[in-house]
Amino acid sequence: CTECLLADRCIYPTVFEIPLTVNETSGRKRISQPPHPYVIEPPDDSKTRYLQGDSLDFSLILFGDACKNLAYFIYAFEQIGSIGIGKRVNGKSAAFTLREVRSDNKIIYSKTDGKIKKHSATSTLSAQTFAETLEDGLFDIELELITPLRLKYQNGLNADLSFDVLTRAILRRISSLFAYHGEGEPALDYRRLVTRAKE
């Protein structure tokens, strides 16, 4: 990719091969592994076998400039659908068709017309809102883990999930997403937030 003529404009490296750049002002220096600007959320069930005609609904969350590249993600999913996914049976993987894409429950892309409708599929996430919520006072949080979760703490994996360890992980993720895909690391009082999480 480094010698490619399209390296400066191609979205592949910015989505899949994010360079580990050092930038004092953005907060990137402390980040060992840059986060990808997308999250694919699987369906909220335990279904592992899909028959012909079954629907597979999933969510795609894009961050930062990746939001401008929705058309490329749609195209990529269409290509994956024609190639197929899952275990090969008789030398073939299961093909699928991307039927539609929705944002805020509105159809913004349909296989029928093959066009992306003008839309505002973006929402602004604020790290400050998260911090202010913690400052408002003590409250109960019930957390249900749907998929396996492993968090590293003090250079080791810990089976116990204390709220302050979870808060550290959330703050680290927010910080790295803002540093790489937002407007730089948010001005949060990390130490105070973790202290509050221990209370």
Question: Where on the chain are the PLM-derived regions?
Answer:
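RNA-interacting cores
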Residues: 1-199
